[in-house]
Swiss-Prot record:
One of its GO terms (molecular function) is ATP hydrolysis activity. InterPro entries: AAA+_ATPase, Chromosome_initiator_DnaA, Chromosome_initiator_DnaA-like, Chromosome_initiator_DnaA_CS, DnaA_C, DnaA_dom, DnaA_N_dom, DnaA_N_sf. It comes from Nitrosospira multiformis (strain ATCC 25196 / NCIMB 11849 / C 71). GO terms for biological process: DNA replication initiation; regulation of DNA replication. This is Chromosomal replication initiator protein DnaA. The lineage of its organism: Bacteria, Pseudomonadati, Pseudomonadota, Betaproteobacteria, Nitrosomonadales. Residues 110-141 are annotated as: Disordered. It holds the Pfam family DnaA_N. Residues 75-139 are annotated as: Domain II.
Amino acid sequence: MLAPDTFWLACLEYFENELSAQQFNTWIKPLRLQLSDDSPEPALRLIAPNRFVLQWVKDNFLSDITQMAENHFARPVQLQLELAGQIPASASPSTGRNNGTASHSITAVFDAPTESAQKAPKDTKDTKDAKEKQEKNPTRLNPSFTFNTFVTGKANQLARAGAIQVAERPGVAYNPFFIYGGVGLGKTHLIQAIGNFVVEQNPAAKVRYIHSEQYVSDVVRAYQHKAFDEFKRYYHSLDLLLIDDIQFFGGKNRTQEEFFYAFNALIEAHKQVIITCDSYPKEIAGMEERLISRFGWGLTVAVEPPELEMRVAILLKKALMEDIILDESVAFFIAKHIRSNVRELEGALKRVVAYSRFTGHALTLDLAREALKDLLAVQNRQISIENIQKTVADYYKIKVAEMYSKKRSRVVARPRQMAMAISKELTPLSLPDIGEAFGGRDHTTVLHGYRKIAELRASDPAVNRDFNTLLHILRG
């Protein structure tokens, strides 16, 4: 007779040590392990809360878990990966340290399919001009923002995977779907890709993409013209509502109240709500608690600044789309020096291409250096390790000299790790060079500090906020 309790606890401990906190809480912690009562051979059921987790575990972790089971029980063990809704009612209680409680980061809220849209409100005098513009593109979606044109890397792979799941099953998979991250990291592209996919699959779907400031303007107009009934009929009748940069709702009480009603109406009707923000939901200034709590009902994912390989891929794909012949060495040069976000990356590419066309010279590595020399000179002058150390020390209220010291107390070690991580992010220096600038430390110490901050950013919104704030300060 198999005893799964001890095995699953060992499994949880292994993955908790191997994965980041976000990965562990998202993929492993929600799983439940049960004995299989209807199999002639020794068998275990590994139960996933939804299809998204099931597929991800199958692709990335199932072979490891199976191998650990065979090592633990010292014999072949059949491991069945199943969806929670497929488990018989007589199944035995779940085992594991989470006591069967699934992680709140992923929740499959609804099972019913999206219903057909209601009729849109009739035109009024005050909305006639706006309606005429909307008739050309009522969704307000950019048709070039698709999943095919979205470059995927470690920084956004979870967000993209969730977006595809939502696009394929709107109102069923994760509702709401909340994406947060800094400026220019692809949040708008990703949510509009969902909208374009939904419209392609169902042209009759009533989809609306809107920036939060435009939504605020709609609320103001409805208030001025006493047209809240029509406002509500329109927004409550959507099949898919995509709200961009919801942080601008902060402090706007009437807007938040109307959005609260719209949010509830759409969720109750099994219609999809998708939101982007520049910060984690609980960190949004001036946002009502009742909205913040609802943002956590579905899936919340972060997008991070792209890593080097992803930046190169973005440049090459952009060049291909624009019929630009771009050598990989030129793409690598641009990507190595432009690290902040996708918009600045594409801006640098446009600058290099324009310089090539104006001068009539081929787009070579030397030309790229010449075209970007002013930009790179400003970056090199402003963002040095010394500047990073001083900025981080001032931020955490410690002495700059403590960056080089041997002190290991948390009040000094954490800022030092933060400065090392930012140095790796913002400078082209190697790990040994960064270590040398921090009191002659070994490159492995720098790498450990970088990974530690990355792990904390995934699990602690305060650390992530500090990191992004410092990047913003240093970049000016």
